[in-house]
Amino acid sequence: MFNGEEVILFPERKTIPGAPGREIHKDAPAPKRPETKKTGDRLMDRMKKVDPNQSERYRQRTGE
């Protein structure tokens, strides 16, 4: 086409208007937050197995 060079046309990317300078593409999936569970409950259960009174002392010390 131009000076004997071949021109390659790419389809336009779909963008969502948002913060300037940061484009969000519809095609790319958004990263998701990893699933985390509250580990404090497990800690209390483990403490009760070792020493039932220790879990109560820990609860008082941490304010739970």
Swiss-Prot record:
Keyword Cytoplasm annotated: no
Cross-linked sites for Isoglutamyl lysine isopeptide (Glu-Lys) (interchain with K-? in acceptor proteins): E64
HAMAP family: UBact
Keywords associated with the record: Isopeptide bond, Ubl conjugation pathway
Ranges annotated as biased composition (Basic and acidic residues): 22-64
The family this protein is said to belong to: Belongs to the ubiquitin-like protein UBact family.
Region spans: Disordered: 1-64
Protein name: Prokaryotic ubiquitin-like protein UBact
The keyword Nucleotide-binding appears for this protein: no
Function of the molecule: May function as a protein modifier covalently attached to lysine residues of substrate proteins. This may serve to target the modified proteins for degradation by proteasomes.
GO molecular-function terms, A-Z: protein tag activity
A Pfam family of this chain: UBact
